[in-house]
Amino acid sequence: MSKIVILGAGESGAGAAVLAKKEGFEVFVSDMSKIKDNYKKLMDDHNIEWEEGHHTKEKILDADEVIKSPGIPKEAPMIQKLMAKGTPIISEIEFAGRYTDAKMICITGSNGKTTTTSLIYHIIKSAGYDVGLAGNIGKSLALQVAETPHKYYVIELSSFQLDNMYEFRANVAILLNITPDHLDRYEFKMQNYTDAKMRITQNQTEEDSFIFWNDDPIVTKELAKYNLKSHLCPFSEFKEEGCVGFIEDGKYKLNFPSDFEMPQADMSLRGKHNIYNSLAAGLACNIVGIDHETLHKGLSDFPGVEHRLEKVGKFQGVYYVNDSKATNVDACWYALESMTTPTILIIGGKDKGNDYNQIKNLVKEKCAGIVYLGADNQKLHDNFDSLGIPVRDTHSMKDCVAACQELAKPGDTVLLSPCCASFDLFKNMEDRGEQFKALVRAIGE
């Protein structure tokens, strides 16, 4: 019996353990952190051996194959030992893909992944298809394949997941954009990060489709290096030669594989970045064969994604917007670009090698104040203090919201769009967004 070791017992690891057990492997799960009770119960229910708080080296190095949590960097000591030994290391998505013939619609990109993935799932589910949501959002793909298999899966993929995928094939692959992000995990080399994102196209055949943003200079440059067999489906904000998705004369238009159009005003998602997300999602659904009436309805009634330009409300005349998912500079740029009132920008957190020069002009144009929120705000001071905009330095969400109240005037917008990861002060970006919303709503009480 082959031995599979799973490192990390979160959503993906616990799900992979269940599928591996079902497929007859000897399974051992190891997590250096504390495992959540629900995942312990799931593994106990399937008689899966697990450990937490440490790694038993002998058991792990005895594996025939290792499934690694995407959160574990390749520099981790145990990963280095496994690599030196030549043990295959794969992702949960790669493993799950071996045990299903379902159609895979896969989405990656530095920004817009969650919105686009959620929109595609919303439309396909509305059409009555048997579809699952997996990857960075939804339930573990492996667990769904093991216990509630579907005919279609819509999967959000990070670069970390793609790093350990080799044989997996996306029937519809979407690459929204490539901008600097997570460079701390890629030796601060943009090409390493780009190579990871381009892995979404691997193993595609003539029967498959690759949807990408035609105006992304990095993507178009990379395409020249790849001899892709899949059908290329570029989209753009405006009509360009070769593009099969675009906006023209106030209409949202697709012309592959069938012609579809609807008034742009009917689209539920607003902002330039959401034009791209909606075009990519519409093309994917059109390729899958969603009827045009359902496609129009889905693009019109999609409610949006939590923590992504989420309107929290208007309190004491000030609008509050939660964009906690903006964990890189490019995401913050799109958020600022969509602002129509004087903005108090909340920025800061765990810096991932950010270049703030990309947003300085927009900050000068849009912002009436800046509130720094992080354990160490020195880099923010170095970049923004000289702009002549009022700034405040804070180290907790409570102090941050209080500073925003001090700076904001009626009619202004307070925008939490941090450019950074959240792990310096918060559990995750969701925790950061929830704390922000709770404190803001308390203003109105």
Describe each PLM feature range.
Residues 1-91, 95, 382, 392:
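N-terminal leader/targeting and accessory segments in enzymes
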Residues 2, 21-22, 58-61, 70-214, ...:
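Phosphate-binding loop of NTP-binding sites
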Residues 3, 15-23, 130, 262-368:
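Nucleotide phosphate-binding/pyrophosphate-handling subdomain across enzymes
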Residues 11, 73, 111-115, 275, ...:
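Residue-level detector of alpha-helix initiation sites
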Residues 20, 66, 107, 136, ...:
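Residue-level signal for inorganic ion chemistry
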Residues 26-32, 210-214, 346-347, 366-375:
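Short internal beta-strands
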Residues 39-41, 357-412:
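C-terminal helical cap/extension that packs against the catalytic core
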Residues 51-54, 90-94, 227-247, 296-300, ...:
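Beta-strand->loop->alpha-helix junctions that form or flank phosphate-binding loops
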